[in-house]
Amino acid sequence: MQIYNIKIDENKKETTNHGVYEFPIQIYETFLEKNVLGFVNWHWHEEVQFCLVTNGRVDFYVSENKYTLDKGQGIFINSGYLHMAKPLEKESNSYICIDFNTKFISSFQGSIIKQKYVDPYIQSNQISSFVLKNDVNWQDSILDKIRKLNRLYYEKNDLYEFDIYITLISMWRDIISNIKINKEKNEVVKSSDENRLKVIFSYIHENYMNKINLEDIANTIHLNKSECCHLFKRNVKCTIFEYIQDYRINKSIDFLKNTNMSISEIAYENGFCTSSYYCEIFKKKTNMTPKEYRNLNKK
């Protein structure tokens, strides 16, 4: 299953369902060229995530870190960290995602398993992410298990839920056996940059349909305009203005696909001052006009 455009709330938290309460895991393959902007923009979720590149080359950004992954390599992204994925090649770039809530492997609330082997790792500010490579035995083992999980999830043979559970437990054991953290120095808090970015994202998502001033954004995190721009560009790898454009374009997609509103109405509804400017930016970002996109995606 492809998740084309990730739904996020005003705090940049992803609102896509990652499985169900009884079985809190979702496995899917992302084809970046099928996303309207050609990449997966910044978001975060409570679930931990394993990714395995199945085609092409992909840049993964996690907080201030950037990883370039080739086909066959993977990445672990911890709970609650902002992340983004961009293709490096013009042709098909894809990766398998495994998202699961760690309650799934925690036995029960208050258990030794949860207290000793799960919570210290997902709450740690020492582990935001790490790359999985084929030439490291324990990492290669996790990559094999990602492939196995993908197969189990879609074949759905007898006992597949149980087999998925066992495989996840084994993957988690690989991690805690090889990634060492100083539990005495463990801090639950994320970096100040991470928290400030979430405040900026929240402000943009609450106000994208209106005119947004840089001064207002800077005031939300108590920095001057220059410091605010520098922080954003350093971490998000684009300007605040560019991000706002991308967010407005993404928000307009639902209107194009699911309403009969005119292009002008959609432009104004999503914060563009004129329909011509909306069409110009839309074509620049997607290589097609809003009308062409609507015709291709009529329900």
Regions found by a protein language model. Give the residues of each.
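Generic protein-terminus/edge-of-domain signal
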Residues: 1-74, 80-81, 89, 115, ...
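Regular secondary-structure segments
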Residues: 54, 126, 143-154, 201, ...
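Ligand-binding loop in jelly-roll beta-barrel domains
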Residues: 80-104, 110-113
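Basic/polar phosphate-binding segments, predominantly the helix-turn-helix DNA-binding elements
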Residues: 174-180, 199-249, 259-261, 265-296
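Intrinsic-disorder/low-complexity linker and hinge segments
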Residues: 187-195
